[in-house]
From Swiss-Prot:
Ranges that cross the membrane: none
Family label: Belongs to the universal ribosomal protein uS4 family.
PANTHER family for this protein: 30S 40S RIBOSOMAL PROTEIN, SMALL RIBOSOMAL SUBUNIT PROTEIN US4M
Region ranges (Disordered): 31-55
Organism: Burkholderia lata (strain ATCC 17760 / DSM 23089 / LMG 22485 / NCIMB 9086 / R18194 / 383)
Boundaries of every S4 RNA-binding domain copy: 97-160
Name of the protein this chain belongs to: Small ribosomal subunit protein uS4
SS bonds (residue pairs): none
GO CC, alphabetical: small ribosomal subunit
Amino acid sequence: MARYIGPKAKLSRREGTDLFLKSARRSLADKCKLDSKPGQHGRTSGARTSDYGTQLREKQKVKRIYGVLERQFRRYFAEADRRKGNTGENLLQLLESRLDNVVYRMGFGSTRAEARQLVSHKSITVNGVVANVPSQQVKSGDVVAIREKAKKQARIVEALSLAEQGGMPSWVAVDAKKFEGTFKQMPERAEIAGDINESLIVELYSR
């Protein structure tokens, strides 16, 4: 299945919440009705959503937030299930430690899609080595940086400026002047978006 390249706001409306696919710092809530489904008048239904439907919707939402395709997502879940601890939390930690997400969390990209592009275009290094695989897992202590040739890109400078104003996660330490950051540790569940109900995804795959 190909990656979705259509209107980002449409996906947020479909999930009924801002997935921050267009900007991490500016909410879509003021621009469109997130409680209305896509369509000329917003599709409505009087039917109650089944448990399976609710679980599936939550999985779709998380896939879209992190820009992960179905096959990748299944692999992440399988790995999360193999690890000790809470499977749902393990899943979110695996997604959060993807290189494209870490680049986004450090403020080098205004969206995960933009961060993914920076990685694919070889504008990012990990521990001094050029990295171009968005799904690369970042480990505690890894240093992620913008390559010298990309430091003057307006989109990176602007994204970093906005991130500094909005604040960054406690599990990354960023030196904006050097355009680099350190992945201090895996984020705790409380440090990851609270509007995700990962237990629904665990229930879905446990069927």
